[in-house]
Swiss-Prot record:
Residues 1-10 have a biased composition (Basic residues). A motif (Nuclear localization signal) lies at residues 102-108. The gene is JARID2. Residues 115-127, 195-208, 216-228, 268-285, 365-379, 506-519 have a biased composition (Polar residues). Associates with the PRC2 complex. One of its GO terms (biological process) is stem cell differentiation. Belongs to the JARID2 family. Residues 178-191 have a biased composition (Acidic residues). This is Protein Jumonji. It comes from Gallus gallus (Chicken). Regulator of histone methyltransferase complexes that plays an essential role in embryonic development, including heart and liver development, neural tube fusion process and hematopoiesis. Acts as an accessory subunit for the core PRC2 (Polycomb repressive complex 2) complex, which mediates histone H3K27 (H3K27me3) trimethylation on chromatin. Binds DNA and mediates the recruitment of the PRC2 complex to target genes in embryonic stem cells, thereby playing a key role in stem cell differentiation and normal embryonic development.
């Protein structure tokens, strides 16, 4: 038995041509092919017998209006004779007879007729071939026709491989016009005067031809091609056939006449497009003749040959198209058919039956809307634009640039254009006419995604081919520019988030474009801004471009040397963009599983906090609170926050929850809310969110809604009267203003954790725990009061917040969320201009809830995007941002590793992720490199505009008593258009993958991401910055803002290190700053001693006097802490030179705040001063620096003589300050005294 088993398992058809096809299917295919061939031969014989007379008349000449009545009667007889033969096909799917058994089986058999009859003249990717009626001409032409028949297996191969790279090159244009002479012969053959064929096929071709224009009869009735009214229409159809049958017109006069007629038809007020009925009627005899000529002359150029098709060519085409239409159960929902050079799109059978039945029962309804496959927009639709598309259509007539919300978009899709060029679709007047009229009509099913994509493909084809339409020349969009503007998210799904666009990074960085090319990338957008703003175009017109630098390979070595060489030219702009040489190709290596805490930004609240959407949400929250329901955070679906305010509005417009459930419209509602279809259980989560948060609110009466709205508005007014504008409100923790904007701390934003309202209130993470503080501090009392007030404010307590703490996610999860939010905001890949336009619309109108995520990640924890291995290329390059902090030209190298300053950090964003208007708190310059992902839009205001900007923002935000710049730094986005109109210089640039952006000290900068992107940033500083940095440090201390590093430490570290090297320029810059610092430090020490603070100790040493007085106490651990970790309790100043500590409470004061505390408390009990350098060491260091700077001038005496008078009284007043050099006994005596 073992020997027989292999024989049983042998597959008999292993080497057969049809391997992989089940035997049952193969048998059916063979049977159907046989029947199809047989039926084809019979049909050919019948056509030869019935239509020979009409065929000869059509070939030999033109039929005019003056033909005899005898010909008219002869044509009528032909119609009647042939009616029985084509009755099955004339009753198209628009007729109710389609549901009968024979009609249902018929398409299946006739669909296979393609295999025996298909011709190599139709586009390669369309499943419906052009099948023009093959009327038998003389016998010599029959042999020519037979040579053009392809093999059945070739056609099957084409069907399986169409649109894919595997399609053989000889089949790429399978079905398109290749042999021009044969093509013309075929057209002559198909110019038939059989009016019966025209009549019978009128309904067939009208159903799928969605874009065909038509005229209305005076009574408003339009022929729908149904078999029921066929006999009633025969006189009119007969009359139409007689005039529509003239053959080719080959002279230029006829062409010019037809062009004029078509131009007139385009502007005819009664020209409309029907959704399913395309029959032509005429108001008068002359108009009918002209329109018939226009419809007949479809001119398109294929391989340089102008061809013209006759109307009768559509008869069999429509017939075959109806036969081969795929089953509704298949995945193919739309099929494309080329008839007379016009692309028409048809839906599956069931949908067509529904539409045609609807139109059949309502023939008197005005046909003023288009099909679902002809939606006019060629741009990415946003949620708002999709919902309000109908209102914005009426004023938009451009094909290549469609206005949406009053702004002009000029996006074209290169991918779709390229595909259509590859298919070889023929252009025609009718198609261009339909495209021109597209903006005047509405689609009944315009939100269907497939239809939108097909319509976009058709509209973009019309843009590229540049024909004359109505005397206007269509704009041709260069493919090169389209490639350059193409977004970078398309390939994201094919690779990991960390590496998904690295190939694009290399391509972008490798292109050594000229200056004019780079500028052309943005100047069109700027000019677009002028048009898209309408009345305010003067604001966008003044928006300047940031300089673009292209260093050579030799110049691109040391970033600080290169930046210093161009500083004079570019610093006045506040920022510049650097495009590296082509050989700069560092590979971005990120761990896809690295985790970080995100930041959630509410884009609609980045401008003014209060808007329509925020008001509705406040009403919902207030009602829920009255019901005892707490909504700490909005529900999430697919990682995206659900817009509850829009949700409740849409569900009411659809008739309420009950009707939505009964009619099963939850799916449609989810699509309208733009919830990602890939989100798990999106309908269940949507229903759960409604029941949990909106059901109670939705059941309120209109009077209760108005009452609730009045209460919310009253509460808002009271809040603003007490605290000022919402934008100026700050949380309690901002009194601790922990760290600068760009500093990540363990993956947290700004080193802080949010923790109030939806999420947690701000809490400083790098300040040591203050668990033992007493209420004797006024700040603690103020904090407690503010906490109580916030609880009383209720739902409006967090209105001033627009940024919240998110979750800890992996890079892969973040990427998926970014993809979902992109799909919520746009229906397809947007351009930079479209993202920018939609972003400012959301910020200014505030009518939609849009929440996006971003993250700032410390590279010291999760790794840099740059190569860091010693053997890796570019790991030691100067522009590698992990190498830059150690550059000898940067004075920040003396600080060591400081998170957010000398340690680079990653900026991970998605579409609309924003870095609001701000400047570094220390006014430090920095460099940003875009590793991978979508482009980023940067706006910059130079430092010279600071005072003017302060006044403008103060006026715009109505900041009563609050400096404008302080409000601007509270996450407020003001449009560059508004700032430009106020006279402030604003510059803009678009950073692409693989490019650097350099920001100069003091510049105000904001950034908007156009999609998922990863960039890396690090600070640097030269000696020219020290004066500005010292001034900024004093201002931050006054405003009680925490600094990431101590300016005192930096100056002393520079002085110690550079004094050994005798670096004259650097020492001369810091000498005056060191002198000022010395005077301030010694004066404050003397004042504290005079106030009664006599206990002191040096850092790192234990005061023996304290242990002698209290033997039970052990040395405090905080005595051994570095001063960089100790901040003043009051002003958040980093205490480097000295500080005052309260031993019992473990609280730190700077000398200035300690003096105020002693004066207020009238006691120094429990306080001790800690210092790093004693008085003599400070003076000695300053004198050494001044001596090296002065050199042989002898001016060092001035540096030494200043502190001398202060030194004498200090020593006489206290003998225990230099306690490290005194004995323990003397220290204890001085302490006891």
């Amino acid at each position: 038995m073992s020997k027989e088993r292999p024989k049983r398992n042998i597959i008999q058809k292993e080497y057969d041509d049809s391997d992989g096809i089940p035997w049952s299917e193969e048998r059916v295919v063979r049977k159907v092919l046989y029947l199809s061939l047989k039926e084809f031969k019979n049909a050919q014989k019948r056509q030869h017998g019935d239509g020979i007379s009409g065929s000869l008349k059509a070939v030999n000449g033109l039929l005019t209006n003056g033909q005899s009545k005898g010909l008219e009667s002869e044509q009528l007889e032909n119609e009647k004779d042939d009616a029985s033969q084509v009755s099955s096909t004339s009753n198209d799917i628009s007729s109710s007879d389609f549901e009968e058994g024979p009609s249902r089986k018929r398409p299946r058999l006739q669909a296979q007729r393609k295999f025996a009859q298909s011709q190599p003249n139709s586009p390669s990717t369309t499943p419906i071939k052009i099948v023009e009626p093959l009327l038998p001409p003389p016998a010599t032409q029959i042999s020519d026709l037979s040579k053009r028949k392809p093999k059945t297996e070739d056609f099957l191969t084409f069907l399986c491989l169409r649109g894919s790279p595997a399609l053989p090159s000889n089949m790429v244009y399978f079905g398109s016009s290749q042999d021009d002479e044969d093509e013309e012969e075929e057209e002559e053959e198909t110019e038939d005067t059989k009016t019966a064929t025209n009549n019978a096929s009128s309904s067939c071709q009208s159903t799928p031809r969605k874009g065909k224009t038509h005229k209305q009869v005076p009574n408003g009735q339009v022929f729908n091609g149904s078999s029921k009214s066929l006999k009633e229409k025969e006189p009119a159809q007969k009359h139409k056939s007689k005039e529509a049958t003239p053959g080719k017109e080959k002279n230029s006069e006829h062409k010019a006449e037809s062009r004029k007629d078509q131009a007139a038809a385009n502007h005819h007020p009664t020209t409309n497009t029907g959704s399913s009925t395309k029959g032509l009627t005429a108001n008068n005899h002359h108009t009918l003749h002209r329109s018939a000529q226009d419809l007949r002359k479809q001119v398109s150029k294929v391989n340089g040959i102008t061809r013209m098709s006759s109307p009768s060519a559509n008869a069999a085409s429509a017939k075959k198209m109806r036969d081969v239409r795929p089953s509704p159960s298949k995945t193919v929902k739309y099929t494309a058919t080329v008839t007379k050079g016009t692309v028409t799109y048809t839906k599956a059978k069931k949908e067509l039956v529904k539409e045609t039945k609807l139109n059949h029962h309502k023939p008197s309804s005005p046909v003023n809307h288009t099909i679902s496959g002809k939606l006019e927009s060629s741009n990415a639709k946003t949620r708002k634009q999709v919902l309000s598309l109908g209102a914005s259509k009426s004023n938009n007539t451009a094909v290549n640039g469609v206005k949406v919300n009053g702004k002009l978009n000029q996006k074209t899709c290169t991918k779709e254009v390229g595909r259509q060029l590859r298919e070889g679709l023929r252009n025609s007047k009718r198609r261009l006419e339909e495209t021109n009229h597209i903006d005047k009509i509405q689609s009944p099913t315009k939100r269907m995604k497939g239809a939108v994509n097909l319509a976009e493909a058709a509209s973009k084809k019309a843009v590229v081919e540049k024909p004359l339409l109505n005397g206007h020349l269509k704009k041709e969009v260069p493919e090169k520019n389209l490639e350059r503007n193409r977004p970078k998210r398309a390939t994201a799904g094919k690779s990991t988030p960390g590496k998904q666009a690295h190939g694009k990074t290399e391509n972008a960085s490798c292109e050594n474009r000229s200056t004019s090319q780079a500028e052309s990338l943005h100047k069109p957008q700027d000019s677009m801004g002028k048009h898209e703003k309408g009345s305010s175009k003067s604001g966008w017109g003044m928006l300047g471009e940031i300089p673009i630098l292209r260093p050579s390979t030799k110049e691109f070595h040391d970033p600080l040397i290169y930046i210093e060489s161009v500083r004079a030219q570019v610093e006045k702009y506040g920022m510049c963009r650097v495009i590296p040489p082509p050989d700069w190709r560092p590979e971005c290596k990120l761990n896809d599983e690295m985790r970080f805490v995100t930041q959630i930004q509410h884009i609609h609240k980045l401008g003014r906090r209060w808007g329509p959407n925020v008001q509705r949400l406040a009403c919902i929250k207030k009602h829920l609170k009255s019901q005892g329901i707490t909504m700490d955070e909005l529900p999430l679906i697919g990682g995206c926050e659900l817009d509850l305010a829009c949700f409740v509005q849409l569900i009411n417009e659809m008739g309420g929850m009950q009707q939505v459930t009964d009619l099963k419209k939850w799916n449609k509602l989810a699509d309208m809310l733009r919830i990602p279809k890939t989100a798990q259980d999106r309908l269940a989560k949507l229903q759960e969110a409604y029941c949990q948060y909106l059901l109670s609110y939705d059941s309120l009466s209109p009077e209760e809604h108005k009452k609730l709205e009045k209460e919310v508005l009253l509460e808002k007014e009271i809040l603003e009267k007490r605290k000022g504008p919402l934008e100026g409100h700050s949380e309690n923790a901002y009194k601790f203003h922990s760290l600068p904007r760009f500093e990540p701390k363990n993956g947290l934003i700004n080193g802080v954790v949010h923790k109030n309202g939806f999420r947690n209130k701000l809490k400083e993470v790098d300040v040591p725990l203050k668990t033992g503080r007493r209420r004797l501090f006024a700040q603690e009392k103020e904090t407690t009061k503010d906490d109580e007030e916030e609880e009383e404010e209720g739902v409006l307590s967090d209105l001033h917040k627009c940024i919240y703490k998110g979750r800890s996610v992996s890079l892969t999860t973040f990427y998926r969320t970014a993809r979902n939010i992109m799909n919520m905001c746009f229906t397809k890949e947007p351009t930079v201009a479209e993202v920018e336009q939609e972003y400012w619309r959301l910020v200014e109108q505030k009518d939609s809830h849009v929440a996006v995520h971003c993250g700032k990640v410390d590279t010291n924890t999760h790794g840099s995007g740059f190569p860091v291995g010693k053997s890796e290329p570019f790991s030691r390059h100067g522009w590698n941002l992990t190498v830059l902090p150690n550059n000898t030209g940067s004075i920040l190298r003396h600080l060591g590793a400081v998170p957010g300053v000398t340690i680079p950090w990653l900026n991970i964003g998605m579409v609309f992720s924003t870095s609001c208007w701000s400047r570094d708190q220390n006014h430090l310059p920095y460099i940003d490199y875009l590793h991978t992902g979508a482009d980023c839009i940067w706006y910059c205001i130079p430092a010279a505009e600071e005072n003017k900007l302060d006044d403008v923002v103060h006026t715009l935000l109505q900041a009563n008593g609050t400096p404008g710049l302080e409000m601007l730094e509270s996450n407020v986005m003001i449009s560059p258009e508004i700032l430009c109109k106020e006279g402030i210089r604003v510059h803009r640039t678009v950073q692409q993958s693989g490019q650097f952006v350099v920001c100069f000290p003091g510049s105000f900068v904001s950034k908007v991401c156009c999609g998922y992107s990863v960039s890396e940033t690090v600070h640097f500083a030269t000696t020219q910055w020290t004066s500005m940095g010292f001034k900024t440090a004093k201002e931050m201390k006054r405003r009680r803002i925490a600094k990431p590093f101590s300016m005192e430490k930096l100056l002393y570290q520079i002085a110690t290190a550079e004094a050994k090297k005798e670096n004259g320029p650097t020492l001369s810059t810091i000498s005056s700053l060191l002198g000022e610092l010395r005077d301030t430090e010694l004066r404050q020490r003397r004042q504290l001693y005079e106030a009664g603070l006599h206990s002191s100790a040096r850092y790192g040493s234990h005061d023996s006097s304290s242990t002698a007085m209290d033997g039970k106490k052990k040395p405090r651990k905080w005595l051994q802490l570095e001063t960089s970790e100790r901040r003043c309790q009051i002003c958040q100043h980093l205490c480097y030179l000295s500080m005052v500590v309260q031993e019992n409470e473990n609280v730190v004061f700077c000398l200035e705040c300690a003096l105020r505390h002693v004066e207020k408390q009238k006691s120094c009990r429990g306080l001790k001063m800690m210092y790093r350098y004693d008085e003599e060491q400070i003076i000695s260091l300053v004198n050494q620096i001044c001596g090296k700077v002065s050199g042989k001038n002898g001016s060092i005496e001035n540096c030494i003589s200043k502190p001398t008078p202060k030194r004498g009284p200090r020593k006489r007043a206290t003998v225990d300050v230099p306690s490290s050099r005194l004995s323990s006994s003397s220290s204890s005596k001085s302490a006891s005294s």
